[in-house]
Amino acid sequence: MNKSTLNNPVFYVSAFVVFLLVIIGATLPNRFGAVAEKLFHFTTIHFGWFYLLAVFVFVVFLITLSLSKFGKIKLGATLTKPEYSFFTWIGMLFSAGFGAGLVFWGVAEPMSHFFKTPFPAVEAMSEEAARVAMGYAFFHWGVSQWSVFAIVGLVIAYLQFRKKRRGLISTSIQPIIGKNKFIADTVDSLAVIATVMGVATSLGLGILQMNGGLKSVFDVPTSIWVQMAIAGVMLITYLISSSTGLDRGIKWLSNINLGSLFIIIVFVFMAGPTVFILNTFVLGLGDYFSNFIGYSLRLTPYTGDTWVREWTIFYWAWSTAWSPFVGAFIARVSRGRSIRQYVLGVLVVSPAIACIWIAAFGGTAVYNDLMNGTSIAEAVNADIAVALFETYQHLPMTTILSILSIFLIFTFLVTSADSATYILGVMTSRGSLNPTLVTKIVWGLLITAIAVVLLLAGGLEALQTASLISALPFTVILLLMMASFTRMLSKGEKKAEQDKE
């Protein structure tokens, strides 16, 4: 660990706060969970409108920016070429973004909406419920969620590679708040805390999901010992990957992830109800586009229904809490892209892959329940972890598909953890693009230790809920980043025009 880390208050403050929260979560999981739940509910009830409006603004801003004259500006020097091939770049975006989550929720979400519909007037498990379920699943995994990551990544990439400044959240809002060390350290500490808590809980929940998959396929018992073994293998794998750097470990894993994802999609598409999947995809896209503004700003103040809070607002809070990590990683791998290319990759290609996955897997599950009288929706309602494997029961080569999916979840989680250790190293090394291996190992060990401790104590979901509370201040920070970026961009463009004259 170098001096830039040891002398950085961000490292000590964030490590202390995380340690404190983990101790509370491990010793008082129920009480901690109740308090975290109450605080999170307070933010979603009173500021749900703010989340929805902010994310909608992000989408409009990014699309407008990409289509404007600023779209051709490079994230780097004018002649800089992209650091990674398009396929590898998309694989990296997807792996850091939400790969492991999509593998499960690609079936679980549409089937959850099919079983309990977003609109009270729509009859559950009907043809109309299926249509609404697919449209809403597309919406939740589409451009809105990615716009949150894209804002952070765009501003940091512009600062790092165009302006040669530190790639920190605090640096990105400096034009608005000025050079205030206390505010800067507070913002960066909050980013580190949210990243550690978010990644650790996702790792823990991913381990539980993998254990569920192993039980479904190989009848491996659900036990803490199995989960600790999975955590140990995962730790060793992502520390080895981390030691090889971005150009080897994460790059290779990302290519494997995206390649495996496409292989599974193609198989399900060919072996499943092919025409139904195609129809579902096209209809789902149509519903997504036609309902985009309505879904983006949907609230239910007249009925008191909680569905939007439980789903849409929860998703936007989750995305915002994760945005410092995912956005910073996206920035790191996007050097050499123009703003227009960046928005196309992050805001169009990545969500499109997600929608294709949902259409293939969610469409197959819906088809079987509607046409063949299966009970996948009921099974998912009882246990979300079985969603994917329950769907595989109605496809050929069930065991091979299940093994491939468990492997894919594992590699996605490893890539996310590896990416997180790198970004945490950057954040706690004053923005250095090459944090030391020791710094990355320290964060890797801490993330795994937190996940295992909370698996033992049963405090994972409490810590996850607590991490989502950070979404409220981060939504404000993201809006400041957007305003700051607009100011920097207009000044930079004006200066460039003057230099030409």
Swiss-Prot record:
Organism: Virgibacillus pantothenticus
Cell compartments where the protein resides: Cell inner membrane
Keywords: Cell inner membrane, Cell membrane, Membrane, Stress response, Transmembrane, Transmembrane helix, Transport
Matching NCBIfam families: bcct
PANTHER family the record matches: HIGH-AFFINITY CHOLINE TRANSPORT PROTEIN, HIGH-AFFINITY CHOLINE TRANSPORT PROTEIN-RELATED
Induction statement: Induced by high salinity and cold stress. Induction is mediated by SigB, the master regulator of the general stress response.
Main localization, broad class: membrane
Transmembrane segments: 9-29, 45-65, 86-106, 137-157, 190-210, 220-240, 258-278, 311-331, 343-363, 395-415, 441-461, 465-485
Coiled coil: none
Membrane topology: Multi-pass membrane protein
The protein's role, per its UniProt record: Mediates the import of ectoine and hydroxyectoine, which function as osmotic and cold stress protectants. Also has minor uptake activities for the compatible solutes proline and glycine betaine.
InterPro entries recorded: BCCT_transptr
Top-level taxon of the source organism: Bacteria
GO terms of molecular function: transmembrane transporter activity
The protein's name in its UniProt record: Ectoine/hydroxyectoine transporter
Lineage: Bacteria, Bacillati, Bacillota, Bacilli, Bacillales
GO cellular component term of the entry, any: plasma membrane
Family assignment from sequence similarity: Belongs to the BCCT transporter (TC 2.A.15) family.
